[in-house]
């Protein structure tokens, strides 16, 4: 059937900010879908709240709205735009839930708007746990014994009937949010309460636990003519019980027989047909290891994390195809854009093994609960491709960027056998490394399988890697063995370690012996048809499929997996850099390892290498491609860390030179730059040991800000108030950055701001200045930022502009540079310079309408800023007021303190724009999911230093209609100024009233600035944890509370009696 002619304008709903469970895969799928619809001639209107995405660029849709994804705002857009249809299936769970809510309000019927792709009845049947169970029973597809519960009592009754353990799955949530495995009544009550709170329909499914079964996923597509295909099947390394987003995943399935694959394939196709899904869908199965018994776990009736992985694993662009199916095209009418010869109805075939590894945030949250279960905890993921499972797995481990090039944590060698066994039994984020350690101690496969409940096939592969390590250690410089271990994915650095050499010597040895990688193409058809996709992976075989072109090329290093501190913002900059390289007439080559992102879409660069971002892997690509140079400034710290080792090996780094990068990153060199320019800077110093650190702090006076050098996202950065705290900090955190000293600065209290500038070595352009709402001491990535600044005098703006231009010129910056300032006593103090793209580049690009990364790339490639139409200085402010607000994922992680400080904790961002600051703030809070009640009870408990300021805020909260509750010290301060307040006992008095009131929704807002006691048992920590667990808005900064008051005051009308 040809595409539909009766619809012309389509509204696409994006997926909002990046949170755990919903990451960059939706930027990738959303971008693909919008472009596919435009390709077919439709007018596309996009709404999304996340400015850090390619999807929200003006070229992606005909009109782009960066607005909160709420019924209130999207309804406004629907009334204004009057689209014919909505495509809700590519915005993740957020998009689906919003479509359901809009439908329930009646606005879609009122305006005659239809939903494309998957119908609401299908979404309901797949997402509503009871309807899904009924459908499966009708199809005779087995599901685990289960019951629907709408309250805790119902959940307990069913658990008593079938016995523990049970799995709890909330309805209409994503990433397993609110779910878990309960082993007893206490755990059941906790998980069920949380799940009911987080489910938008207050419903959970309680089911018999089938933990231990194999978990298998099928990615399927169907069109309106009922043609259906399997795009990819995948098998989880972890058995059922660990969320698939937190499990290692292999594609295609590795341990299933043909009969099992066909059985599950038939079931998946039967389910997608019964649901009448038009587009992509993900079906998850649990398969018994010892029989042909299986259960259907769940169905996602939309584009998902797994479909992004399947797209990159096979080269088959699922979201693009789903969008075309949604407008009526059939699979046999759509060309496969990879081969450009076959049709989309051909099922992809793989002649390689793909491994996906999750990337967890526990390097940021040392106290976090690392146990893995049905609720997802990973922030991102990496993918690697190899010809053997071992090669694919080892490449994935190097891609993770957790300081390892091989599955070996040296510290684990010190564990006792009991401790090691305990870690293997319990699924956690480092289980792979514990399993490898067990084989190094000669545990048998049977012993490890018994402890871990893992499939012996996978354990055998890990054991094989350990056996090869032993072979290497026993046969130093054996060239035959060298060729063999390279085929199994061993890194030069690991071989060098076992042979007592330097990695460069192993590399040299390989080159002399012609043991070199070749590059194979990902072509969707296992080489059956000729393909011209420029999408490659390395392996050690004989023939290569990647041929260097005659055109001069530039290599851009991507930013690797998404993690806290290095998010999708850097992928955004990478993609824009590629566009500019192509505009300048060069061939653009990308190297990256992240399957979720737009940069690894095969249609973006002229060539894509899906490879780990390590020195060895990058040098291998450079050897083949011989680029004019390498651009590192858009890939975050991942790429910057490669600059020096590449330059040392004679590779040309384009943009700011390595020497100048070092002058900005090395503390002593940077101090010299600041002194030579006579710029104000907080007093500080460096130390390489504890005694030196204590001496520096003593000299400059407490409080001090301490951090290691060369880090991103404020890793291991803290504000320290006395010598004891400093002593503790050095014992805990200083090993974070080997070879680099600790930096210690006097901590100034003041307004913070930052600026991104572009320079060509002469002209320096400042597109805009962003003022932070939270004062200095909270990481810039966790602060709300406002453009243009609202409270700075012209004198301060001039100081910032002047200092930025001087710094840029002195550091010989070519490309982008980010500078952060504290405004203290009328002076702009420089606190940090980052000579690269920062995480504010997308936000600033959107609000100033200047594509910063493209302008910077053209400058790097030699097109001066004057030729691009720019002069030195700060550009005039654009219209409107724009607020960038951080978004956190604390509700997904247990035992993680939400108190904000100098170490970054947010996973994503949203933007609110309007004509006044209060309105822009309101939109930013709504977009970030912080829905503020206009009245209620506010619990305020603050440290002594904040009491005066908190009193002024408390008065304003009373005026807008809030009742106040405070702990005794804070309450006394309020009562002194005549504020009405109820006193509540502190937790250490043995009373739990505070926590009970939060749990029972008797508190609508919590403001808590109690000290960052590292103890998880402290009062402040427990209050903050309770607020997050029960979804009560929580502020840990008085500045954020002040911003919220601006919004509440905007909404409140003044009421006062008439004067007598």
UniProtKB/Swiss-Prot annotation:
Residues 930-1060 form the MGS-like domain. Residues 402-546 are annotated as: Oligomerization domain. Residues 1-401 are annotated as: Carboxyphosphate synthetic domain. GO terms for cellular component: cytoplasm. It catalyses: hydrogencarbonate + L-glutamine + 2 ATP + H2O = carbamoyl phosphate + L-glutamate + 2 ADP + phosphate + 2 H(+). Mn(2+) 3 binds at residues 820, 832. Mn(2+) 1 binds at residues 284, 298. Its EC number is 6.3.4.16, 6.3.5.5. Residues 547-929 are annotated as: Carbamoyl phosphate synthetic domain. This is Carbamoyl phosphate synthase large chain.
